[in-house]
């Protein structure tokens, strides 16, 4: 069984900016131990003759060729807009200069 110390849990909590109680620290240590023990099962998997791969299925993206096509006229695109300005959509401000 992999032993996770109290200090390791506190360090992880600190990195995640979490404040946890001593009881939660103990519970997290036990939970992490269980997770690590479960993950160790991969060490005993027979991978002889198995090629390394990033995906379990031999699939690849099927993409269409990029082709430039004529878009819709500007007037039509802006036809149902609530507000326009200089030939563009005008939307409410969501950030002020202080946020930028």
UniProtKB/Swiss-Prot annotation:
It catalyses: L-glutamyl-tRNA(Gln) + L-glutamine + ATP + H2O = L-glutaminyl-tRNA(Gln) + L-glutamate + ADP + phosphate + H(+); L-aspartyl-tRNA(Asn) + L-glutamine + ATP + H2O = L-asparaginyl-tRNA(Asn) + L-glutamate + ADP + phosphate + 2 H(+). Pfam families: GatC (PF02686). GO terms for biological process: glutaminyl-tRNAGln biosynthesis via transamidation; regulation of translational fidelity; translation. NCBIfam families: gatC. The keyword Transcription does not apply. This is Aspartyl/glutamyl-tRNA(Asn/Gln) amidotransferase subunit C. Keywords: ATP-binding, Ligase, Nucleotide-binding, Protein biosynthesis. It comes from Staphylococcus aureus (strain Mu50 / ATCC 700699). Heterotrimer of A, B and C subunits. One of its GO terms (molecular function) is glutaminyl-tRNA synthase (glutamine-hydrolyzing) activity. Its EC number is 6.3.5.-. Belongs to the GatC family. Allows the formation of correctly charged Asn-tRNA(Asn) or Gln-tRNA(Gln) through the transamidation of misacylated Asp-tRNA(Asn) or Glu-tRNA(Gln) in organisms which lack either or both of asparaginyl-tRNA or glutaminyl-tRNA synthetases. The reaction takes place in the presence of glutamine and ATP through an activated phospho-Asp-tRNA(Asn) or phospho-Glu-tRNA(Gln).
């Amino acid at each position: 069984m992999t032993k996770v110390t109290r200090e390791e849990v506190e360090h992880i909590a600190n990195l995640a900016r979490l404040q946890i109680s001593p009881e939660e620290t103990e519970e997290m240590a036990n939970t992490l131990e269980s997770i690590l023990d479960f993950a160790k099962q991969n060490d005993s998997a027979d991978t002889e003759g198995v090629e390394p791969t990033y995906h379990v299925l031999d699939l690849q993206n099927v993409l269409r060729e990029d082709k430039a096509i004529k878009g819709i006229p500007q007037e039509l695109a802006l036809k149902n807009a609530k507000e326009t300005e200089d030939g563009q959509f005008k939307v409410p401000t969501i950030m002020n200069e202080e946020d930028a």
